[in-house]
Amino acid sequence: MNKYLLAFIWLPLILFTSGCTSSTQEEQEYGVSSINAEIPIPKKAKEIEVTTTSSNPNIKIGVKYELDNIGGEQGLYRPDGYFNKLNDAGWIELEDKRLGHVQFFEKKDTVIAIEIHQDTFDIHEMNKDAKF
């Protein structure tokens, strides 16, 4: 009798808790950046602005994208899924150059800077002779 009672109590509890846990994270789809076709961009990201001239002499061209919660609250969290996708595409993070919200990546002889905020991110292609 006790076995049936325990099974009656535990079985719904186990089913309820397993139904409330998240399954595998939804796979993100990627397109390409408008400033460099080798830079993957989440397809859900909306291009806001392209900057062709900058007061910063190190920046060749830049683009700003909007994507809900890419950087978490106040942009404090690193979007590891996106950075893993960059790595898969051949971009190597220059960890020693990281500056707060800004991470640098290199592929062949091109360096990009990615600045992460809560709901936006900026990508800047750096000039060949950039000092950063």
Summary of predicted features, one role per range:
Residues 1-5:
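Positively charged n-region of N-terminal signal peptides that target proteins for export
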Residues 23-70:
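Compositionally biased P/S/T/G-rich terminal and signal peptide-adjacent segments
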Residues 50-132:
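Extracytoplasmic electrostatic interaction patches
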Residues 15-19:
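C-terminal motif of bacterial Sec signal peptides marking the signal peptidase cleavage site
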Residues 6-13:
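Sec-dependent N-terminal signal peptides
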